[in-house]
Every structure is written in structure tokens, then in C-alpha cells.
Amino acid sequence: MGVPQGDVEKGKKIFVQRCAQCHTVEAGGKHKTGPNLHGLFGRKTGQAPGFSYTDANKSKGITWDENTLFIYLENPKKYIPGTKMVFAGLKKPEERADLIAYLKESTK
């Protein structure tokens, strides 16, 4: 199917409103309730150094990319049962695409 083209600025607003309470994106950023997301693309689930993940996250074994994030962000607990991420998800495809566009820019 492919991920729709997202808007980085809209994605940044979504991140600030819905994600920044638990996640940071900058290199060397601290882990909060959730892991720092720097270097997310191309990394396997449950692999951010120094963050305590659930076994479910560590054993999922997928690599984060646009497609896996697009599915995950719709309903995290359905995609990784047992994750400690409490976020219910983004149901609108365009919001997920915007957030992914922002994450691609901000986590490199």
C-alpha cells in the first residue's frame, strides 16, 4: 500500500501534542517514560541503548521504517501486545503520515 506523503510541520505539532511527554528525538536525548527516538529508522524494536523494554518489544523483531511505523502508530497495543506504550494510536492515515515525516527528519 505505501505510506502517504506527510507534512513535516504538521507532524511536529502532533509530536509535541501527543508524543513529547514520553519521547525525545535529538541525539543524546534522555529516555523519559518512553525511549529516545534518535536513530529510530532502521533499528529493530526494543533496541534503544539504555532503555528498559518489555519482552514483547524486544522479541517483536521487526525493523522500524515508514511502513512498520504506519501500522504500529494506528494501534500500538494491537501491533505489539504487551508493550508498555500507553498511547492509543492515531486513527487518521494522514496524521500518521505527518508524524512519520517529522520523525524521519528529526531522528537522523
Curated annotation (Swiss-Prot):
UniProt key word tRNA-binding: no
PTM section of the record: Binds 1 heme c group covalently per subunit.
A GO molecular-function descriptor: metal ion binding
Keyword field contains Ligase: no
GO cellular component: mitochondrial intermembrane space
Coiled coil regions, renumbered to chain: none
Signal peptide: none
Binding site for heme c: C19, C22, H23, M85
SUPFAM superfamilies given in the database record: Cytochrome c
PROSITE patterns named among the record's database cross-references: CYTC (PS51007)
Transmembrane intervals: none
Compartments (UniProt record): Mitochondrion intermembrane space
Keywords for the protein's UniProt record, in alphabetical order: Electron transport, Heme, Iron, Metal-binding, Mitochondrion, Respiratory chain, Transport
Pfam families named among the record's database cross-references: Cytochrom_C
PANTHER family tied to this protein: CYTOCHROME C (PTHR11961)
UniProt function note: Electron carrier protein. The oxidized form of the cytochrome c heme group can accept an electron from the heme group of the cytochrome c1 subunit of cytochrome reductase. Cytochrome c then transfers this electron to the cytochrome oxidase complex, the final protein carrier in the mitochondrial electron-transport chain.
Family the entry assigns: Belongs to the cytochrome c family.
Descriptive protein name: Cytochrome c
Annotated organism of origin: Schistocerca gregaria
Origin organism lineage: Eukaryota, Metazoa, Ecdysozoa, Arthropoda, Hexapoda
